[in-house]
Amino acid sequence: MEAIRVFGPKLGSRLSIRSHTTAFPACKLSRFPLTSFPGKHAHLVLLKATTIPLASGDKENNRKFEKLGPSEWGNQFLFAHVDLSEMDALEREIEALKPKVRDMFMSFKGMKSNKKNLFLIYLLVSLGLAHHFEDEIEESVKGCSQEMVEMMDGENDLYTVSIIFWVFRTYGHNISSDIFNRFKGHNGKFKECLATDAKGILSLYEAAHMGTTTDYILDEALSFTLSYLESLAANGTCKPNLVRRIRNALGLLQNKNVEILVAKEYIRFYEQEEDCDKTILEFSMLNLKFLQLHYLQELKLLTKWYKEQDFESKLPPYYRDRIVELHLATLAYINPKYSRVRIILTMIYTIQIILDDTCDRYASLREVESLAATIERWDHNDHAMEGLPDYLKSVAKFIFHTFQEFEREVSSESGGSYSLKATIEDCKRMMRSNLQLAKWAVTGHLPSFDEYLDVAGVEIAVYFTVAGILLGMENINKKEAYEWLIFRDKLVRAMSTKARLVNDLFGYKDDMRRGYVTNSINCYKKQYGVTEEEAFRKLHQMVADGDKMMNEEFLKPINVPHQVLKAVLDTLRAINICYDNEDGFTRLNGNLKNYITSMYVDL
């Protein structure tokens, strides 16, 4: 059985967990979990930043800061048991079922075959099975797109049209939203009779969120469907499994949610449907169990890695202990072959959160300046860290040692050195932004809204995150992928802006409670002379407009593999679950806690 390598600064000899080489292509398992999207979580600490001398010694112990509790998960996952014989059995069953599902793509005949294939694709995506059939799906979508006119001619079923639209947009085909004009009456509005089709209304609602900046009809569709769905969710006037699905969609849409979380819910919905295919249902349940065990293996290793960093003895208790939450966010990258991506991202997110909490919650301004200079020099030698307080030496060493592990992992790969340098540069950029925010925070300075986003959008670390994804990916042209990333700056800037705004919107009350005034809401209020309520409304609209612009960017021709583009999209999904109506990452509550239980506990 081929092993998945695990690397780590303190793990000594290389550990291994086995990969299942037939059903799930092997990859080298890196060692770190990806948590939530750490950004400027400035909410929960009293900023103390101006008077402490650089080498302050015992004075560090006198600083005032709000300590967040340790992870409530403790060592639970460090000692989790994964039955490898059970995984072997699951693998064999999965391999036996895959050809049967693959044959379904070829079994449909006649003009209706294209529609049936698109419905099958929607089902596979919803059940978390699409990564098993990437080639078949790509070929099928491409073939269907060439017969679009014939396929849609005379099709007046709302559910069918909405699903077809959803699949094409999901796979990067810019099908025109004009196909929904057929559902409008003479008055130019959507027909009220459509409201009797609950599944159709739900599918139109989902399709409406795939819109771009010029898909005005989808704005109308969103307005039309929302009130009906809210009524159905409140009154429960359709089948219970559909009511549950509607409520989930109103909370967090499928195309904005993490695939594995969608799959677990969709299986519950699908098994109660009259047209449920027993083979596909069985496949999806086996696949879900296998993935959960696979992820649990990763989390177990990452928990060990995290414990061995010994932050508890090296740092004051100002940082968030969130290794489980970090790994959960990496599950946005569902494919088992992306173990290395998930592990590297978890380590990068750990770097981000330690840096963020150090600069935002504890360090003096002089210390932040000194740490920034140390990271800018990128000198691993101890003499380069002289003058830093001991706790900052530990922070710097942790970052440098982690990147040394990255270097050992990727240096022999094609493009590995290039991708490593690019990731280091993004780490430096994030640190510079942390320094600028610290300077503003000390004086309570409110820059212009645009200037704030330029700085804070980098600090939220989307660029650093995407660079980490590319660093962890194998069998891609990394130089080409990074150049695409730089060229498509509009896309990544929009992602950064969304992450920044969402972070600030949900963290505003905590920011203000502790006197941290430099945030997007206050900067917008100052620049445009509006009220707090108006600023909130405008920033929420900016988030929605940003989603449209990103949808638009994803539909443009690309010169990189689909897997790279999808990974960027999955990063957005990770952001969404971490800020699902609240900042559940900092406060350890709400949906994020439920997601963890669903993935790692309820096996």
Curated annotation (Swiss-Prot):
Keyword line: Cytoplasm, Lyase, Magnesium, Manganese, Metal-binding
Organism the protein comes from: Arabidopsis thaliana (Mouse-ear cress)
UniProt-annotated binding residues for Mg(2+) 2: 356, 360
Binding of Mg(2+) 3, residues: 503, 511
Binding site for Mg(2+) 1: 356, 360
Required cofactor(s): Mg(2+); Mn(2+)
Name recorded for this polypeptide: Terpenoid synthase 28
UniProt comment concerning the protein's domains: The Asp-Asp-Xaa-Xaa-Asp/Glu (DDXXD/E) motif is important for the catalytic activity, presumably through binding to Mg(2+).
Gene Ontology cellular-component annotations: cytoplasm
Motif (DDXXD motif): 356-360
Localization (cell): Cytoplasm
GO MF term set: magnesium ion binding; terpene synthase activity
Coiled-coil portions: none
Family recorded in the similarity comment: Belongs to the terpene synthase family. Tpsa subfamily.
GO biological process: diterpenoid biosynthetic process
Upper classification of the organism: Eukaryota, Viridiplantae, Streptophyta, Embryophyta, Tracheophyta
Cofactor info, note text: Binds 3 Mg(2+) or Mn(2+) ions per subunit.
Annotated metabolic or biological route of this protein: Secondary metabolite biosynthesis; terpenoid biosynthesis
Name of a matching Pfam family: Terpene_synth
